[in-house]
A protein has these predicted regions:
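Post-HEXXH active-site segment of zinc metalloproteases
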Residues: 42-47, 53, 65, 69, ...
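Histidine (H) residue identity feature
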Residues: 10, 19, 73, 77, ...
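Auxiliary, metal-adjacent structural segments of Zn-dependent hydrolase domains
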Residues: 2-57, 107
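Aromatic-residue detector
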Residues: 20, 24, 69-75, 88-92
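Polar-ligand-bearing catalytic/cofactor-coordination segments
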Residues: 56-76
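Active-site rim elements
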Residues: 1-4, 95-97
């Protein structure tokens, strides 16, 4: 992982460490950030600048690595998955995106 990605993750972790959402702090072990502009050209992803799936964070452009709010938001989703690996993704099927409590939690960081 390059230095810019490592710094972005550590800044986001420091921001999340100020919150006590879960019993254990977010772990960066195995977490990766990928800059994948092509992904965000796909219809489902066009509305996002970042996206998380388990231990992977995808961002639209390299410049977004400097967006501490975005990276912290996506890392919060990783943290949620570390504690609720089944419930968290299923919540999007049950309540959708707009009313999802995990989205509200991530938006609060």
């Amino acid at each position: 992982m390059d230095e810019q990605k490592r710094v972005a993750l550590h800044r986001a972790k420091a921001r999340l460490d100020a919150h006590a959402f879960y019993p254990r702090p977010v772990s960066l072990r195995g977490v990766r950030i990928w800059v994948v502009p092509w992904l965000f050209r796909l219809p489902w992803f066009r509305r996002f600048d970042g996206y998380s799936a388990w231990w992977t964070i995808a961002v639209r452009s390299r410049e977004l690595l400097a967006d501490e709010t975005l990276v912290a938001h996506e890392l919060c989703h990783v943290w949620q998955m570390q504690h609720h690996p089944v419930r968290m993704p299923l919540s999007y099927l049950l309540v959708g995106y707009a009313r999802n409590p995990y989205e509200r939690e991530a938006a609060s960081v």
